[in-house]
């Protein structure tokens, strides 16, 4: 499931200074689901895809899809800073309401510096992160770095020695201008990223929101994927069966070249210029879990040697992505302030260009419901329902936009902030998505089918976003504040890969928050009412259905997986309190408490399956899946001498599994903790723990249950889903010189 935009984020304290909008309390790098990706923070709308990441003033990836940002980015010693960019900034910088990671590459300074981090964990993961920089004279300098990661995973897979193998190589040359007027740098990075996505497992859904292990299967420790080391698929481009080695089918290779310029102009104005060229290719074999069915002697399932199989069958959908991106993004920004210091303004202009495409093939497989399962053949074949879903596009996208903002300290009591952004978007290229009936996806679909007709597309739109904030001080350290922002977007290039033609309706998000703030030497708190809505949300969810008769190359009783585009609205009303307490020297406690009611609106769909069965569903008024109505974060930290002790605990209340809200998971905790020790100015050590409570974290929505309305048959029901990272201890040594 992929959403048009990730309109995400909880709330931040309002701040008068732009740099203070980048709040360090969000801990986006502590992710319970993945060790290599930043986490996403929900504002009350569904979260899909991956977190947005900026580096050196521009996005790491043109899209938050295909060549995902985290596949060419790592937060480590090659960055001089990594922080959180708030929705206040993102609504102007990117045109959406979301959090983002914002990072700056480390350039050479006025002396030689070196940094090395070495980490390992209890499951065999090892990583080395190193960077050296040195001046060359006359303001010039160079910096070189590399990040290497070897991760077999906690559930060691037989199909590959490593679940993740990361190779990043980075180098830069920079120039510091005389009299401290600024700095310029040219940065190159090559990324080679191997990643197997496999955090699935079977479990028993008890029926009261709890789960228990199935037949001793250890979530997070046992492998739940066949050991086959090859991917066999029907190539959507050629119409022929193709084979790839499993590691090759899950590797991204990316080149990035960044230029940065920061320069102080006369009169206190600052100029910042950023430009980036990126070219890369992504092979990605993405497996998702579908339902578990029961196979009888006549079901047609067998092992590779022809032995008939009876018993539980795990169905999976595989997507094989063959995608590329070649993009160029540039911007120039001026910042300054008025003579009396009451106004702080910013103006920026951007031009982004992208040439991208994908050939995405799909098929279904089946395997045993067991640890280290064996692949099952259906009617003598290892896969079925080839390309009943498929993507293809090859095109270009241009974005030209500009924005301006101003912070106005009207008086000692009144502060105002406002900004507006206008964007011109043009999308053009080739796809197979017009009204020609032959372009409709079906089992056996490929672009060489005589009935398929590639069509040209060329669409242009204007997108707008704006924000307004106000803060009124009633007395010292206490006052009222409010903010309203809005962002409108349209379909981008990657939405043209499927059938039918993507919607050209604008997708608009509106966000309001308002309440009180209280600040003194021991507390910094905001408590606000929040409301966010999204109109014309676009999604391509997958729905499961047990066939009532033989159809689509499958037999009656087998489960079919149908993917269809849908459009609907969403809305969430909530209340959030966010506070940082400093009751004693060295002690800091961050607490955030959220109560909200996330709901679907105007959400109706009518899927028709291969056996002719049509179902009608109306999810309007239902709670959005995988979002909790109550969230709590508690993050204490205590420093004394060379020691630092910290803890991060997040509670998520009940989350619904399906859009009908008939099934749900009980609340869960995500817990992290650690001890840091600074031996001297050059050496320090850390011991960190993930999932201290060792919760299984069966979470998210389960596709095979999306249309279930009666929960009665699903007590002690065997299903499969995702899990969070198991209890993990990691040790790190940091050396600087």
Which stretches of residues belong to each language-model region?
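Gram-negative outer-membrane beta-barrel transporters
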Residues: 522-524, 528-542, 550-659, 681-682, ...
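Short acidic/polar hinge/loop motifs at secondary-structure boundaries
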Residues: 58-85
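Surface-exposed extracellular loop regions of Gram-negative outer-membrane beta-barrel proteins
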Residues: 389, 426, 439-447, 458-464, ...
């Amino acid at each position: 499931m992929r959403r048009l935009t990730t309109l995400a984020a909880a709330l931040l304290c309002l701040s008068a200074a732009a740099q203070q909008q980048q709040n360090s309390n969000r801990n986006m790098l502590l992710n319970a689901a993945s060790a290599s990706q930043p986490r996403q923070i929900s504002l009350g709308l569904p979260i899909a895809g991956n977190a947005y990441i900026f580096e050196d003033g521009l996005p790491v990836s043109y899209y938050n899809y295909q060549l995902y940002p985290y596949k060419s980015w790592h937060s480590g010693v090659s960055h001089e800073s990594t922080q959180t960019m708030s929705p206040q900034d993102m609504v102007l910088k990117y045109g959406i309401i979301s959090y983002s990671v914002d990072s700056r590459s480390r350039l050479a300074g006025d002396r030689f510096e070196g940094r090395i981090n070495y980490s390992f964990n209890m499951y065999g993961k090892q990583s080395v992160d190193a960077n050296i920089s040195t001046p060359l004279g006359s303001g010039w300098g160079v910096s070189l770095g590399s990040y290497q990661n070897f991760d077999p995973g906690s559930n060691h897979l037989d199909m590959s020695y490593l679940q993740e193998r990361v190779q990043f190589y980075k180098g830069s040359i920079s120039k510091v201008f005389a009299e401290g007027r600024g700095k310029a740098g040219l940065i190159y990075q090559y990324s080679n990223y191997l990643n197997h996505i496999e955090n699935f497992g079977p479990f028993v859904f008890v029926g009261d929101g709890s789960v228990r292990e199935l037949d001793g299967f250890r979530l997070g420790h046992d492998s739940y994927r066949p050991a086959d080391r090859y991917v066999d698929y029907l190539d959507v481009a050629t119409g022929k069966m193709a084979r790839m080695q499993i590691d090759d089918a899950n590797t991204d290779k990316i080149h990035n070249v960044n230029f940065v310029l920061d320069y102080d102009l006369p009169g206190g104005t600052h100029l910042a210029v950023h430009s980036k060229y990126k070219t890369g290719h992504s092979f990605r074999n993405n497996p998702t879990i579908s339902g578990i069915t029961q196979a009888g002697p006549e079901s047609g399932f067998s092992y590779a040697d022809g032995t008939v199989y009876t018993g539980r069958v795990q169905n999976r959908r595989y997507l094989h992505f063959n995608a590329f991106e070649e993009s160029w993004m540039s911007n120039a920004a001026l910042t300054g302030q008025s003579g009396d210091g009451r106004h702080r303004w910013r103006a920026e202009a951007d031009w982004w260009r992208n040439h991208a495409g994908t050939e995405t093939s799909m098929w279904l497989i089946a395997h045993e419901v067991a640890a280290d399962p064996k692949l099952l053949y259906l009617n003598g074949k290892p896969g079925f329902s080839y390309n009943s879903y498929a993507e293809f596009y090859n095109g270009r996208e241009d974005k030209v936009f500009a924005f301006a903002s101003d912070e106005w300290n009207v008086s000692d009591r009144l502060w105002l902030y406002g900004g507006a952004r206008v964007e011109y978007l043009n999308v053009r290229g080739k796809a197979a998505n017009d009204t020609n009936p032959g372009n409709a996806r079906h089992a056996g679909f490929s672009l060489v089918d005589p009935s398929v007709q590639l069509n040209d597309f060329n669409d242009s739109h204007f997108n707008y976003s704006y924000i307004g904030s106000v803060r009124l001080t009633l007395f010292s350290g206490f006052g009222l504040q409010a903010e309203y922002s809005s962002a409108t977007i349209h379909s981008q290039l990657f939405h043209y890969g499927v059938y039918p033609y993507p919607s050209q309706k604008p997708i608009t998000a509106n966000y309001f928050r308002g309440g009180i703030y209280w600040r003194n030497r021991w507390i910094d708190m905001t408590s606000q009412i929040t409301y966010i809505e999204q109109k014309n949300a676009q999604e391509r969810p997958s729905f499961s259905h047990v066939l009532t008769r033989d159809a689509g190359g499958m037999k009656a009783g087998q489960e079919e997986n149908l993917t269809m585009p849908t459009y609907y609205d969403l809305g969430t009303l909530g209340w959030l309190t966010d506070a940082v307490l400093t009751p004693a020297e060295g002690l800091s406690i961050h607490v955030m408490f959220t109560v909200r009611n996330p709901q679907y609106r105007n959400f109706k769909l009518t899927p028709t399956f291969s056996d002719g069965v049509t179902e009608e569903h109306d999810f309007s008024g239902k709670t959005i899946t995988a979002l909790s109505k109550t969230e709590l974060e508690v993050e204490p930290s205590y420093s004394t001498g060379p020691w630092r002790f910290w803890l991060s605990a997040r509670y998520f209340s009940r989350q619904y599994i399906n859009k009908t809200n008939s099934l749900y998971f009980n609340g869960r905790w995500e817990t992290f903790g650690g001890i840091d020790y600074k031996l001297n100015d050059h050496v320090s050590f850390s011991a960190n723990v993930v999932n201290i409570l060792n919760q299984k974290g069966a979470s998210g929505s389960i596709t095979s249950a999306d249309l279930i309305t009666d929960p009665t048959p699903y007590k002690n029901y065997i299903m499969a889903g995702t899990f969070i990272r198991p209890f993990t201890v990691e040790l790190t040594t940091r050396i600087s010189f």
